[in-house]
From Swiss-Prot:
UniProt function note: This protein is involved in the repair of mismatches in DNA. It is possible that it carries out the mismatch recognition step. This protein has a weak ATPase activity.
Protein name: DNA mismatch repair protein MutS
Gene3D superfamilies: 1.10.1420.10, DNA repair protein MutS, domain I, MutS, connector domain, P-loop containing nucleotide triphosphate hydrolases
Species assigned in the record: Streptococcus mutans serotype c (strain ATCC 700610 / UA159)
Superkingdom of the organism of origin: Bacteria
Keyword RNA-binding: no
Lineage, uppermost ranks: Bacteria, Bacillati, Bacillota, Bacilli, Lactobacillales
Record's keyword terms, sorted: ATP-binding, DNA damage, DNA repair, DNA-binding, Nucleotide-binding
Membership in a protein family: Belongs to the DNA mismatch repair MutS family.
Gene Ontology cellular component terms for the protein in this record: cytosol
Length: 849
């Protein structure tokens, strides 16, 4: 169908749609949002709704699908979750009063980064991120429209951008410059981001601080412009832009946070089994979000950490007061998101009631905090604004039984507005008057069944059956005739009805106006409400950390400037919690000033990785202000943590385990300082044995000689333990085992010195390999050990060879090649070999045959 043949309504649809080609256009028509053409076809498939057509008898019917306006949000949520944009076109005038086609406009574009309303409420932040560049560095800005938070920073390069974008759990990225092919590939394909583009800077002097760097202001200004383009309104809840520096927090790449299960369990993708899960005893949505932020960005300032610790200690010292505080916080709703709903003009009476209930709890919370009588809480108490005038307004204005909608009436409390009360009196008395008229006319007419009914079409009427029509008085006038009865009116009834309908209409209009005025008054308090939310969130997180510390017998860590680590009987806090009643075996970790590297050897499944993660989690917990899982802990303040734990292939970008290992190792040794913590687990296992060993040794030497960072390096290359003879800051430790009657028990305890065996066959036994296979492996191992020759590669790459033999012997003869073959076989860690490593090993062995 050509545009010339379209109806005015469809022409209007196409005119609007051309401005939003990348979004589903929900076009309001009466009680439905309609979709047309390709939008309808795609939406019908995705949303599982009926696909029909407009102008069905035409040569080219227009595909059409629709959803009811009152339940549209659930369908919008589905589209947004799948990464689509949705444009909402509303009717801007009453269709009954419209001349020609009803005026329609897009009032909002909802995108994955701009979700505010949702049928699936989630306490987590939803950050919309923008990126700009001046060619030498990147400006990154982000905001959460549901809370009003607004931040900006400068990043040196694309890897730093990638890490920060991942850390922010970004779904939508606003780009302010022309992307290169590599950048486009990174963001679209590898990171699976929805990209939106904005070249215009929105200059808002109230939100943007001109003291910030130009590149940050550019990113923030373009983000603001994009938000104004999509939301189509001024947003009073957006907070002033806050500059932050990555270096002001404990730096951790996204891969590090993932490998340590900080915010979610890397294997399940769920909260359970993460540090966040362990520490979350918060009672409010704001507290939950702030706890995630603290875990994501631990501090590097000992004074700020100490302030948090002091408050936690205060809470621990006052159990009953803390319990009262916890109970009071349960009555606090999500102030930040309630404020944003007010700003968006979407707050309903229930929202205001929740806000009022929250404000009624604030004085109680403040009084409880004052009862602790602690100087550590003074600053926090002073920041808590009780807003008594706002609480009084909501309490006096909003009816406690108010509905969710703002058009049904029943929102405003009796006694708040004199005129509204008069209208309500008329409606109540009108009902009584009608009852009196019914009784009077029944008696006068002698019609015993006479009654007054009401419907929208006929209004109020007397219902008279056919058998009583002869008794109808002359002053009754007919309103409707039915098969078995007729409906009548009277002048008196019509007068009362008119007064009641007028009162009802005026009451509804006035009540709506009053509610809008109240909501506007609430909007003027948004900044104070947001500040209150921050204070209550801080209280909530600190009480949560106190509860966790008490329940799990954690201790307050201390900090030193000597770069010494002393953790007495430390535990992996999350593993301990998951184990529940099982006994957790603690480990002591010590690094003096002279020690920078612990080289850890021991069998698989013995606890090397847990020991490494234990240290990292202890550091993170300590630096976010939490108490820690140990008998005692004295730590330096670390500036960064670098990890390579586990074989996390980067399958999206097609990079192998070994490539990822080398990239992460490269990043660590280049970015680490003497104040950093490095955790490398089995580095080098992704390539051939000697390649891996050589690289592992070279990396250890580089860290020792040039970086100086505190390092835990777990390895299955037992030859590396000899490094302690010439690297003065390296010490060997191992996971202890107990051998008895041919059985091996892993003690999960770290002991000094190197491990003497790998216990690979024992691990295979635990894994359930057949008994005859294991027995055969034992015999082969004994034979191989007996025939092993004295070929050794020392740490200076000097090789000692046995005396040459004149001719090639059989496989079981002891010649140079066989000795080398035996040595390589013994070095193979079969339980850890990947398919690629196995192929490399076979090629190496084949060369010796």
């Amino acid at each position: 169908m050509t545009k010339e043949k379209l109806s005015p309504g469809m022409q209007q649809y196409l005119d609007i749609k051309k401005d939003y080609p990348d979004a589903f256009l929900l076009f309001r028509m009466g009680d439905f949002y309609e979709l047309f053409y390709d939008d309808a076809i795609k939406a019908a498939q995705i949303l599982e709704i009926s696909l029909t057509s407009r102008n069905k008898n035409a040569d080219n019917p227009i595909p059409m699908a629709g959803v009811p306006y009152h339940s549209a949000q659930q369908y919008i949520d589905v589209l947004i979750d799948l990464g689509y944009k949705v444009a909402i076109a509303e009717q801007m005038e009453d269709p009954k009063k419209a001349v020609g086609v009803v005026k329609r406009e897009v009032v909002q574009v909802i995108t994955p980064g701009t979700v505010v309303d949702s049928t699936k409420p989630d306490s987590a932040n939803n950050f919309l991120v923008s990126l700009d560049t001046d060619g030498s560095q990147f400006g990154l800005s982000y905001m959460d429209l549901s809370t009003g938070e607004f931040y900006a920073t400068t990043l040196a390069d694309l890897p730093a951008v990638r890490s920060e974008v991942l850390n922010l759990k970004t779904r939508e990225l606003v780009i302010g410059f022309e992307l290169s092919e590599n950048e486009d590939q990174l963001f679209r394909k590898q990171m699976n981001l929805l990209l939106s583009f904005e070249k215009t800077v929105y200059d808002d002097v109230h939100l943007l601080d001109d003291q910030l760097k130009a590149i940050e202001l550019a990113a923030a200004g373009k983000l603001l412009q994009y938000v104004h383009n999509t939301q189509k309104r001024e947003l009073s809840h957006l907070q002033k832009l806050v500059h932050y520096e990555i270096k002001d927090y404990l730096q951790m790449a996204y891969a590090t946070k993932s490998s340590l299960d900080l915010l979610e369990n890397a294997r399940s993708g769920k909260k359970h089994g993460s540090l966040y899960w362990l520490l979350d005893e918060t009672k409010t949505a704001m507290g939950t979000r702030l706890l995630r932020t603290w875990i994501d960005r631990p501090l590097v300032s000992s004074s700020l950490i100490s302030k948090r610790q002091d408050i936690i200690q205060t809470f621990l010292d006052h159990f009953f007061e803390r319990s009262d505080l916890s109970d009071s916080l349960k009555g606090v709703y999500d102030i930040e998101r309630l404020a944003s709903r007010v700003s968006f003009g979407k707050a309903n009476p229930k929202d205001l009631l929740q806000l009022g209930q929250t404000l009624s709890q604030v004085p109680v919370i403040k009084t409880i905090l004052e009862s602790f009588a602690s100087s550590s809480l003074e600053s926090l108490i002073n920041q808590i604004d009780t807003l008594p005038e706002l609480e009084a307004l909501i309490r006096s204005a909003i009816d406690s039984n108010a509905p969710i909608t703002i058009t049904e009436g029943g929102m405003i409390r009796e006694g708040f507005d004199e005129t509204l009360d008069k209208y309500r009196t008329v409606m109540r008395e009108g009902t009584s008057w009608i009852a009196d008229i019914e009784t009077k006319e029944r008696q006068k007419s002698g019609i015993s069944t006479l009654k007054i009914d009401y419907n929208k079409k006929d209004g109020y009427y007397f219902h008279v059956t056919n058998s009583n029509l002869s008794l109808v008085p002359d002053y009754f006038f007919r309103k409707a005739t039915l098969k078995n009865s007729e409906r009548f009116g009277t002048a008196e009834l019509a007068k009362i009805e008119g007064e009641m309908l007028e009162a009802r209409e005026e009451s509804a209009n006035l009540e709506y106006d009053i509610f809008m005025r109240i909501r506007s008054q609430v909007e003027s308090y948004i900044e104070r409400l947001q500040n209150l939310a921050k204070s209550l969130a801080t209280v909530d997180v600190l009480q949560s950390l106190a509860v966790v510390a008490e329940n799990n017998h954690y201790v307050r860590p201390s900090f030193n400037h000597q770069q010494e680590i002393s953790i007495e009987n430390g535990r992996h806090a999350v593993v301990e919690k998951v184990m529940g009643s099982q006994e957790y075996i603690p480990n002591t970790i010590n690094f003096d000033q002279k020690t920078s590297i612990q080289l850890i050897t021991g069998p698989n499944m013995s606890g090397k990785s847990t020991y490494m993660r234990q240290l990292a989690l202890t550091v993170i917990m300590a630096q976010l202000g939490s108490f820690v899982a140990a008998d005692s802990a004295d730590l330096p303040i670390f500036d960064a943590i670098f990890t390579r734990i586990g074989a996390a292939d980067d399958l999206i970008s097609g990079q192998s385990t070994f490539m990822v290992e080398m990239m992460e190792a490269n990043h660590a040794i280049k970015a680490a300082t003497p104040n950093s913590l490095i955790l490398f687990d089995e580095l080098g296992r992704g390539t051939a044995t000697y390649d891996g060993m050589a690289l592992a040794q070279a990396i250890i030497e580089y860290i020792h000689n040039k970086v100086g960072a505190k390092t835990l390096f777990a390895t299955h290359y037992h030859e590396l333990t000899d490094l302690s003879t010439r690297l003065t800051s390296l010490v060997n430790v191992h996971v202890a085992t107990l051998e008895k009657d041919g059985e091996v028990t892993f003690l999960h305890k770290i002991a000094d010195g190197p491990a003497d065996k790998s216990y690979g066959i024992h691990v295979a036994k635990i894994a359930g390999l057949p008994k005859d296979l294991l027995n055969r492996a034992d015999h082969i191992l004994v034979d191989l050990e007996k025939m092993s020759a004295a070929v050794s590669v020392n740490l200076k790459n000097e090789t000692k060879e046995s005396q040459p033999v004149e001719e090639q012997l059989s496989l079981f003869a002891i010649d140079n090649n066989y000795e080398e073959l035996i040595k390589k076989l013994k070095q193979l860690d079969l339980t850890n070999l990947t398919p690629r490593e196995s192929m490399n090993a076979l090629f190496d062995l084949k060369e010796l045959l």
